[in-house]
Amino acid sequence: MSDFLDHPARIRQGEELDLTKLDPYLREHFPNEAGSLQVRQYPSGHSNLTYSLQLGAREVVLRRPPFGSKVKSAHDMSREYRVLSKLHAVYSPAPEVLLYCGDDEVLGAPFYLMQPIHGIILRHRLPPGLEFPAETARRLSESFIENLIRLHRMDYQAAGLSDLGKPEGYLERQVRGWTDRYFAAKTHDYPEAQKIAAWMQEHLPVTACTSLIHNDYKYDNLILDSQDITKIVGLLDWEMCTIGDPLTDLGTALAYWIDATDPEEMQHLRWGPTTQPGSFTRAEIVQYYARQTGCDTSQIAFYLTFARFKLAVIVQQIYYRYHQGLTTDKRFASMPERVQLLLRASWECAQTQHI
């Protein structure tokens, strides 16, 4: 399956790196590498930007905040680097980081370097020519949720990550914070937004347990083994990880997971091959998680409501940068439609309690 490996591409206009400063910086820290510096960009991300750097025989990956970012807390490179520097040893899918640079003089923003993880990333459309039977899709669904459970069971205190977040009052702060972020980045009037915010405040569940949570767990953040796509070898995009209620992580995974029986408009929100024959449904994911962990998932509809609202806010924040002229990436122009879809889906879940 090596033909389906994820590869970097040409750098998007407006997201070029200043090689006159990056090149000498790299040679200072990797003095034994000869040859010219080659830079390409991984094209899929909408948040932090990811580049492939080839310096002689050495390949590294560079992560930096988006250009024109308004939301600094969502792009804290030093925090992400610190988490990964402790996490990789106890949770192998986390990338191995190499170097952090907090000097804005180099690239205009902090960044860090990490080892590349080669493999297959599955997105809303399978790579042309990649097919797998229903039993593989089912095993992949199991691996998807088992890997999340593995993360939630990880002893974050032993890993030195106790100070990463404040679990007390986590869910209440999240609801309040994401509500504030939505209205700070608001560009259109969607009546569902205020209704959802009020409903969540009135229906906050009591948090039963605490764990390290990724906060953006979905297929296109997973790297799969090129020889066995049911084996997860990497988990990317840790900028929102924290200590909190693990059911918020499960809710996020469900928000990205579109069932084959969902309405046609919901199919536009699919972030992975979740409608492949043999794949779990959202209900099966919840059942599997509850069976393996013993967690009470009776209020999972709240967590899905919140997760869909949170995704709407994230998309709205990205669109806000485009709306304000802070980025020219044309992919962002149609994002209000996605915001509206997510808000409608969130409100429907709140009203029906159906996942």
Residue map of PLM features:
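Catalytic-loop of the protein kinase fold
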Residues: L212-H214, Y219
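ATP-binding pocket architecture of kinase catalytic cores
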Residues: S36-K195, W199-L212, S226-T230
